[in-house]
Amino acid sequence: MGTKVSDDLVSTVRSVVGSDYSDMDIIRALHMANHDPTAAINIIFDTPSFAKPDVATPTPSGSNGGKRVDSGLKGCTFGDSGSVGANHRVEEENESVNGGGEESVSGNEWWFVGCSELAGLSTCKGRKLKSGDELVFTFPHSKGLKPETTPGKRGFGRGRPALRGASDIVRFSTKDSGEIGRIPNEWARCLLPLVRDKKIRIEGSCKSAPEALSIMDTILLSVSVYINSSMFQKHSATSFKTASNTAEESMFHPLPNLFRLLGLIPFKKAEFTPEDFYSKKRPLSSKDGSAIPTSLLQLNKVKNMNQDANGDENEQCISDGDLDNIVGVGDSSGLKEMETPHTLLCELRPYQKQALHWMTQLEKGNCTDEAATMLHPCWEAYCLADKRELVVYLNSFTGDATIHFPSTLQMARGGILADAMGLGKTVMTISLLLAHSWKAASTGFLCPNYEGDKVISSSVDDLTSPPVKATKFLGFDKRLLEQKSVLQNGGNLIVCPMTLLGQWKTEIEMHAKPGSLSVYVHYGQSRPKDAKLLSQSDVVITTYGVLTSEFSQENSADHEGIYAVRWFRIVLDEAHTIKNSKSQISLAAAALVADRRWCLTGTPIQNNLEDLYSLLRFLRIEPWGTWAWWNKLVQKPFEEGDERGLKLVQSILKPIMLRRTKSSTDREGRPILVLPPADARVIYCELSESERDFYDALFKRSKVKFDQFVEQGKVLHNYASILELLLRLRQCCDHPFLVMSRGDTAEYSDLNKLSKRFLSGKSSGLEREGKDVPSEAFVQEVVEELRKGEQGECPICLEALEDAVLTPCAHRLCRECLLASWRNSTSGLCPVCRNTVSKQELITAPTESRFQVDVEKNWVESSKITALLEELEGLRSSGSKSILFSQWTAFLDLLQIPLSRNNFSFVRLDGTLSQQQREKVLKEFSEDGSILVLLMSLKAGGVGINLTAASNAFVMDPWWNPAVEEQAVMRIHRIGQTKEVKIRRFIVKGTVEERMEAVQARKQRMISGALTDQEVRSARIEELKMLFT
């Protein structure tokens, strides 16, 4: 047996002979030619025994004898007789990419882009070409791109996939001699997608060729390229990407690369281009930013140690220290201060005046007149070779092309105010609303619609030679120059979590001079959809739930409600809410139209560097709002431990983000904010004898199950089950009644059945009807929220769910709201996904587990509750208010019993309350001196609420991530707090709670070292073993 033919040799021969010959034909020819590719090509073309394909031969007008498709070119332009297949019916698989000739582009024009010389490669032998001969270029049809599999030798074995590259070959021929050769791959890659979309055409001729052609001879060609004006129409796709499996190739844009091949040089170059980052020309050396500690490069791996089916419960958040190292804490001491607006009723602190100046300057950018004539830094300006001196603009990052001047008005005007919690971001934002109002700026209010409307500059005098007008497009359809404004100009839109809706309104009314800002709360089922009404108010406040409800890709053209207004300014409070770039909330925020955009968040990164991508997309920070670029240059380097990813993030954030912490100092080195001291301590409790017996029995039973998983080597495969065991142990530390309430009750069993029912339903119902089926992850998320007792908002009434039901598509709604939305009483559409739902398919959503025993009648205090009551009794005489945090609303139910029996007046705030009820609770707690205690779920207290009326915080049960606890308790230690703050955390000694502390400390130590993936998995198992020792 001879030497095996390599795939490289097969590929070389196929690049010349095309895809019409099988792999076996090529391999046989290579064996006959002693592995000489040139000789093998000659054998294939010259030997009758090989099955010859139908090569392109001279065809008279009116026939189409080739299997490849031709485009119209010089001598055979669109509609000319020489255009193969242009005016004649052919089989569908051989349909010409030209379509139907000149009439296919009727009403548009062909603009001359430029010409160039290129070196073609001959695929034939003999004298067939001379200088000056006009050429016809043949392009493969897109339907020919399907991968094929050819059998292995003698029909056995796996076979080899047919080479995709053979389908991307562009060949050239003459009318008299037939096929001559092929053009270089880099040219074919650029031309194919553009020709297939009928956006360009090329003309060519032979410039020089050998007198006697041989296989793989070089032929010098002259080509001219024309582009169709339809490519620049408003609704035409201008960005073309070639199909590819790799991230780098997926960012290949044909048009900018075609301009490069044609030798076109921009007369106004982009400020930065993709090549700057690939070639590492950007200033990203260690001296350009703070040194990146090894710990930060391990964050992604440590995060993966905590990912499980329960999502947020065991989620590892980035610590404040790591966050400050990643995004940087700006030295704001050098910032200028801006005087407090006269319409603000409070005096700003110096650091707040600095923030106001910084925000105002960032919004102004360049003045409107200057910005309208300044080219956007991501775009380049080209002058085409057309005699009409046409100017086009290309974006090297996105591949977009336009004839409309892309000014800096389209750049982001805003940023991220990332001051740590408690520094007064709300007041700073209100001062910005007053200092730079939309009505005062209305005369110069130029806000391009990012989704389609373009700003057209009357001149580009600031550009360098040649001096051409951006609006000089002779013969161009006038309709392309019209700017149709279908949106109503409006004021400020503030989007916040439902909990903060009333607080924003109260803060504005409290701090703004009466009459200076009109405020409208856009919330509830009866909210108006009239854009004129929304645009009349200076400030419109709404929630992320309303935003998601009004966002619809199918109906985006209707322009109703929030999306019918072009906002002067949009502020996202708690902006990390949109961190998941694929979520509806994130997409809804990105779709808003505004001139100025702000993100307010003390935690711009919560779990991963990817969290920043959603913020940058919302802010329109180019090119980082494009996932391909973010993933290539930031996300992947970070995940691979390359410090360039983090350094690039710092360079991106430096001009658009301001972050100070409570430890930041002013020019004199003094803290920018002086607050009363905070005394934080841990109270360790001892279980009573009966509690210890109960806990030990539960622990032994749980450990037996865990040891079985260890013995089977399936610890990580059963991670969710193990967390369930730990959950019961943690609840037992609070009170044994909690375990009895959950245990194996019918309600808990119903949740498991509910999950199985949803997941098994994929093969029936919705799927058979071709409807959208909820993903397993989404179903598990819904079930877990029910398991935790989280209520959520009804997407119809936008209030807390009442008598909640679940649809087969896993959406939760109020029963009454859903049934009222149907036209008949038996079935209707799900208002979220529009799937058909019958009344019989509705499932009553189980509520938080309640207790199998009469807890009032059989009440017994746990050790932890006894310790809490002792602390509260010590504070009763002082009249200071306290907040009790717990993860479980069932434990809040239990806490109400001893509080009532000991005559402590209290109110309660958790996820089951409506917006009006929340506001009422917070107002009563702040203003009623007799109410000393607020019961609050940890999640409800972790979002933006100002709780400075209290000076004591008690965390009843530890969270997996201490940062979550910290965010909640710091709601009382912030601006407005005048008393010394007391923070107490309760831990039961000798239990899983105490070991959780040790695990967290161990994680922080591990982050400082470089771990392999195997070490991460091993560490994850070791942590679980620690919890069960």
From Swiss-Prot:
This is DNA repair protein RAD5A. ATP binds at D419, A420, M421, G422, L423, G424, K425, T426. A zinc finger (RING-type) spans 794-834. Functions in error-free postreplication DNA repair or DNA-damage tolerance (DTT) pathway. Required for homologous recombination (HR) induced by DNA double-strand break (DSB) in somatic cells. Required for damage-induced DNA repair, independently of MUS81 and RECQL4A. Plays a role in synthesis-dependent strand annealing (SDSA) but not in single-strand annealing (SSA). Possesses double-stranded DNA-dependent ATPase activity. Is able to regress replication forks with preference for forks with a leading strand gap. The keyword Cell cycle does not apply. Coiled coil: none annotated. One of its GO terms (molecular function) is hydrolase activity, acting on acid anhydrides, in phosphorus-containing anhydrides. It comes from Arabidopsis thaliana (Mouse-ear cress). Its EC number is 3.6.4.-. A motif (DEAH box) lies at residues 573-576. Residues 406-622 form the Helicase ATP-binding domain. Residues 83-104 are annotated as: Disordered. It comes from the Eukaryota. PROSITE patterns: HELICASE_ATP_BIND_1, HELICASE_CTER, ZF_RING_1, ZF_RING_2. Keywords: ATP-binding, Chromatin regulator, DNA damage, DNA recombination, DNA repair, Helicase, Hydrolase, Metal-binding, Nucleotide-binding, Nucleus, Zinc, Zinc-finger. The keyword Transmembrane helix does not apply. Belongs to the SNF2/RAD54 helicase family. RAD16 subfamily. One of its GO terms (cellular component) is nucleus. PANTHER family: DNA REPAIR PROTEIN RAD5A, TRANSCRIPTION TERMINATION FACTOR 2-RELATED.
